[in-house]
């Protein structure tokens, strides 16, 4: 047998992390004390009293705490998990050398002991069991027996939840000096079952938690409020405005305190010295803008942090105090006995106590595509010698983050949280998020508006500067006043740029998404990827599973039979067949079809049926308090059979029944087999029992029992048609049918069947064993449809969304249930998976529009269906709950996984988790998706209207003024900008869905953000607002008989402008031509609150703003003018909606404006006239649809480029990933694919996949093996879900 040198990676088999390429390197975690305990050398070693640390190859020494300091730290931190990261190696400065070799050998770890440590094993030693996999170390600690002894756990009963603070300390020598047999016998019959018990949690103060920690990662370092405010202040325009404000303040202070006062010509008294007020007011306004922006971002981060925590948490089954308990994955501790099964993503590191055909996909960790079959620790010890580090067929290790494909088992937890492999890797990969597609679309519009606004601001500055220079000779003012006038021109121009460049526009969608995802949780939609919320708004097709989604997943056996003549049905059910459906009901009556039919079964048949159901099942049982009746957890089909066994066959304890027989081999259910099986020894014979799809069971059965006895058997051939008729009759009644069969072997392994020499623990292959079976019986299982599904399907159809059923049931059952749900129509097509799969691409695309039901489908069929629908231009949402559904969930535009019945793999592959597994929740997701898109459009419509009015009003009034001053001052414009960018977004982005959103067809993918209805409202309202404000400014005094004092009228203009925006905000609550703009406004408290707050602040500004806001108190007539003109915008909006669009298309320059926007925001459009390339981006504001991740990055970079150059600030964070391309290009071409391959995405229980990641990582660590030396370069690694895609394709 091969051996592997610990110092030579080339001889080591593929492992979780090679010593040189892992990130972080194992040397950072090995050779460090597992907690703050004193450390000493085993007396059996050379006699030295302390361990000296080996220097790493880089020359750095690993930190070593003294005995006293560690003891003091431990005493001080009792009750708090130790901070292991404080002991991490300082070798990060030279990762290339530090990661090349472990600093602490296994021998050192085995002979290192810790005084006062309650457990024998340190965290570094437990990590070395699996990183890399090391069976020789398992031999050294005496296998599973030594491991359990060192962790103080009995695998038959689990840990105690009332674990004491251990007075007796366990040393490594106690384990190494134990010469007894390392094989540990686990007494499964000791396990009793118990329901979820809130008391079954390990205390945070226990030694186990203190020493090894909990299965929780530290919270992501979120940005604090001050940091977010500083980032908001990085806006280049705000910085420029701040500089101007400081200069203005300095000049104002000089004028106030350094110049003689100016006398009032009427009173002769000195005028108030307020020259400094404007500078202070501008700075105060900037502080308010920055503060509000920072608070807004801070609240958004808090919401997403809550979302991440909810996504990461799920329940697991553990063995504690001798009973099975359901607990949060966050409560797992080292020493727990964890139950795992197919579909789970392993949340911790551990060693297998028991394995029932466990097969894992470890590609996300090792990069190796082959699936790994696991064995328990005892078997691994038997198959290897102590000098062999690793053999592929003797692998008992489960690594956190890997996926269980088949089987089930029990796991002894050896590492949790930051000490597990997944935890260490995740902590090294935490990063910032990226922009969503809707943010990308908005950024393009923002860029166009920014260019127009920037041009307007520059034009204003140039015109005013020319006018200022022309008048300079005739200006008799002092040089200070001239400087103040010039500064006023600069301030007004810069402030106009603040208003005109919509920094808040690309970020407004984040607010809408944050609100929507938070509210969607209440509707049982847990959004994992933000873009899924947007995409659901354009969904045109839903491909839904049947079980649990359309049905209640509350399965009950209501009919069935044993052999040819013992039939039964539930008292509450109808007779099991229907004459009109072609079945012979008289045959049932003659056979005694009643619940008492079970009494006709012979004892032997009854026992065999019980063992067939109990042993060939992966369900676990729980007992409610003060109840002897078990409750089962697991597959709903299996729980239905077990419930029937309890009720009719006298089953009392499934665990006791399983432990009473010797299970030789177990075949877990798979989509290929459509069945599961088990071989067990019973009364000196070996029974092979199978349950599964009745067609498969009947096909492999050559005989059938009769008269309720195993002794009477007849040939199956003469009864085949009868059973097919029965199964068809059940299917027409929407019953799921299962068949049971068995076979008896006289010896084990059987002599007449070829054995599998490669795996002695599983000697038989399924295809060899599953032949020549005897048919036992069949069962009809009812799963009623959810009461609200037919209405939900009807609502989808009214919303232009086609619903299709994709199920593994037979076509008769599928059509029956689809008809009840309203999915299957008279002109619809139903088809089975194999037939659908065999069609040509052209034929498949031809029948897809009418395909309502796809039965007997495989994961491949579901993928083909999705691909075909997408080729036809559809946006497809799909549901899935199994591991094999992962590829389809990833392929769909939006993947929905089941929160209750779904596997962890399916949840990880999905975009949204249905917490209640209910189809109606998908309909709510569609409504929320459309509402998010509507919210962004509402905000866009509002902001562009304000932009147009503010820009033109400022330019016209400033140019027409004799002193180059605008009617709206800098402080007033900043107040308007605050209303426009933040408060309006809060108000308009938080409208809940209305029934109207599901009464219209979905938008086409890539549709323009602007509709004609939006354009006509923007143009008409802007024209009205400009007309009102300009007339008031230039003719208001004469029309309303005000004195020539401009202060009164300027205040009225400012007040009117703000009230126009406030009432137009109400107007913008609707995007269509319907008149009721107040619909469901009482459901949006935030909108009402913001309206009242803004109105209140405006009143305070006018009354008390004074010199700071350049306003003067106005009389009642002035207030009436302002508010009446504002209110008129509401009936005007109704009038605009009533005008036919065809008429306005001829009058309004919508096409010209749209073309100008498109020309500005996209160079592809400008080159369209001289290019015939069909791939060039569409006209108008329709976004370019990228086809690769690189195109996404390029598109984001291009779209936000102009805004970022002008503003910077928070926008800069959307462009971080652009560094990736540049720095990757700096690498040698031969290294690029290898660097990317080294860095793969994995799942962590504590970190949501809801955000994409991009992390600054020393590149020398990633490419040290490839190149040997690359200096100190750093790159941004932007990694996506490649690992999961790879994992999903492997599953398929």
Swiss-Prot record:
Broadest EC class assigned to this enzyme: translocase
Topology with respect to the bilayer: Multi-pass membrane protein
InterPro entries assigned: ATPase_P-typ_cation-transptr_C (IPR006068), ATPase_P-typ_cation-transptr_N (IPR004014), ATPase_P-typ_cyto_dom_N (IPR023299), ATPase_P-typ_P_site (IPR018303), ATPase_P-typ_TM_dom_sf (IPR023298), ATPase_P-typ_transduc_dom_A_sf (IPR008250), HAD-like_sf (IPR036412), HAD_sf (IPR023214)
A single GO molecular function term of this UniProt record: P-type calcium transporter activity
GO cellular component, one term: fungal-type vacuole membrane
Annotated residues for binding of Mg(2+): 545, 547, 881
Region Disordered, residue ranges: 1-105
Bias kind Low complexity: ranges: 44-60
GO BP annotation list: calcium ion transmembrane transport; intracellular calcium ion homeostasis
Cytoplasmic side stretches: 1-236, 295-448, 510-938, 988-1016, 1106-1115
Transmembrane spans: 237-257, 274-294, 449-469, 489-509, 939-959, 967-987, 1017-1037, 1085-1105, 1116-1136
Catalytic reaction list: Ca(2+)(in) + ATP + H2O = Ca(2+)(out) + ADP + phosphate + H(+)
Gene3D superfamilies: Calcium-transporting ATPase, cytoplasmic domain N, Calcium-transporting ATPase, cytoplasmic transduction domain A, Calcium-transporting ATPase, transmembrane domain, HAD superfamily/HAD-like
Keyword Phosphoprotein: yes
The keyword Metal-binding is assigned to this record: yes
Catalytic residues, chain numbering: 545
Ligand binding (ATP): 547, 638, 691, 736, 807-809, 856, 862, 884
Binding site residues for Ca(2+) 1: 498, 503, 977, 981
Similarity comment: family membership: Belongs to the cation transport ATPase (P-type) (TC 3.A.3) family.
Protein name: Calcium-transporting ATPase 2
Species whose genome carries this gene: Schizosaccharomyces pombe (strain 972 / ATCC 24843) (Fission yeast)
